[in-house]
Amino acid sequence: MLIDVKDLYKIYNEGKESEVRALDGVTLSIDRGEFVAIIGASGSGKSTLMNILGCLDIPTYGDYILNGTHINDRSDRQLAHIRNKEIGFIFQGYNLIPALTAYENVELPLIYQGVSIFQREERVMEALKKVGMDSRWKHKPAEMSGGQQQRVAI
């Protein structure tokens, strides 16, 4: 099992009058290679669930196991390492850094991973080529269409 979530809760302002239960007992299992759609009405907890699955947040209660690793008790630094090595997803707004070129936006995670400059150059251009953006590697997000920005984010 790649992702295994059991009885997951995310409660904001727990025990207070303003308490919000964003997730209330979610159980979910996803196998490697499986495609899953998270659907629901506005305010139903989709983004909260995705933030937890993407290791951007941790649950209030319940268990989250990602590729055999218990996520609940990890430090912020450990979660950042897991995000960098184990999981990724594309945000609706692409989250490209406006001041950086397509090349630099793709290169940035590789820098954080400690990939050598020689390997980075090859991997960045290969990735941009795979999504048809190798000819626009010098362009900043404002100089790209939404679809082009999405391909750079991928």
Describe every region a protein language model picked out:
Residues 1-154:
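ABC family nucleotide-binding domain
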